[in-house]
C-alpha cells in the first residue's frame, strides 16, 4: 500500500494507493492480513493502531514537513496557548500524535472540528 504522495514509478509497483484521509478505510477493506505500508511509517503506525488484527511493515521514510515537529514543539505551543486545541496530521511523529486533541488529515481537520463539537469550549486552534 503506497501513500498518494509516493513517486509515480513506485506507485506502478504497488497494489493500492491511499491518502491520509482514506488510509484506515482502505486498509480495513483489504483481504490481506499483512500490509507493507510505504513510504510514511508515522501514517502507517497511526493506521496500524486502529487495526490490531493486521500486521504492518513500514518503510523508513516520512514527510519532511511533519517529521520535524517534536514533543518539545508541542510543549512550547501548549505553554504559549494553554487553552488551544492541538490538531495534528497522522504523519507527525508518534510522540506528537499522542499529545494531540485531534488527529486527522488536512481535509478532515476543518470538517471534523464542528462535527465532533471540538470547538465548544476552546476557540483557538494550533
Language-model segment annotations:
Residues 1-126:
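The feature marks the mature, well-folded catalytic cores of soluble enzymes
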Amino acid at each position: 500500500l503506497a501513500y498518494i504522495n509516493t513517486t509515480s514509478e513506485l506507485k506502478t509497483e504497488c497494489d493500492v494507493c491511499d491518502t491520509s484521509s482514506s488510509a484506515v478505510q482502505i486498509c480495513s477493506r483489504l483481504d490481506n492480513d499483512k500490509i507493507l505500508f510505504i513510504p510514511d511509517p508515522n501514517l502507517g503506525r497511526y493506521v496500524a493502531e486502529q487495526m490490531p488484527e493486521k500486521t504492518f511493515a513500514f518503510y523508513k521514510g516520512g514527510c519532511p514537513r511533519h517529521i520535524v515537529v517534536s514533543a518539545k514543539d508541542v510543549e512550547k505551543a501548549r505553554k504559549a496557548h494553554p487553552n488551544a486545541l492541538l490538531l495534528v496530521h497522522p504523519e507527525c511523529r508518534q510522540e506528537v500524535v499522542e499529545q494531540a486533541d485531534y488527529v486527522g488529515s488536512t481535509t478532515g481537520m476543518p470538517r471534523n472540528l464542528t462535527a465532533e463539537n471540538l470547538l465548544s469550549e476552546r476557540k483557538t486552534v494550533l
